[in-house]
Amino acid sequence: DKEGIPFVGRAGQLLDKMLESINLNRDNVYITNVINFRTPDNRKPSSEEIERYLPYLTKHIEIISPKILLLLGSTALNTLIGDKIVISEARGKWVEKQIGNCKLFVITSFHPAFLIRQPDQKKMSWIDLKMIRKKIFELKIKID
C-alpha cells in the first residue's frame, strides 16, 4: 500500500526476476491484483471483496486488451477461471478465455510469495515462464 503498486517487497523482487528470465520487465507488461487494496493482515480477499472489484478488473483487462494473461496464484485463478479449480492442476496449461470483450490466452502459475515459501516449486514456474515465452513468439507479439 505504501508503494501504490502491485508486487513489492520480496515477492515483487522475485516477480521481476521471473519476468527478466523471459526478457520481460514491468515496463512492457501490465500488472494488477484481483482487488486494488491490501486486505487487513494481508489475508485472502473475501468473496464479497472480489465480487465488488471484479468489474474493475474486467474493465482493466478490456482496456489493456492483452493477448496473454498470466494468473499468479489461486485467488487470480479462482476469480477469473473458476472457483473449484486447484492451482497445482491448472498451472502450466493454456486456456482460451473470453473476459469482457477480450479473448485471450490464459496461463496460471504459482504466486511469487508462494515460491518464496516453497522454493522447490520454482522449477514448475520456470516451465510456465518458458511456455509464455514460446506463446509470445507464436503469436508474434512485439515486445518494446
List the predicted regions and their residue ranges.
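A polyanion-binding, active-site-adjacent surface
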Residues: D1-D144
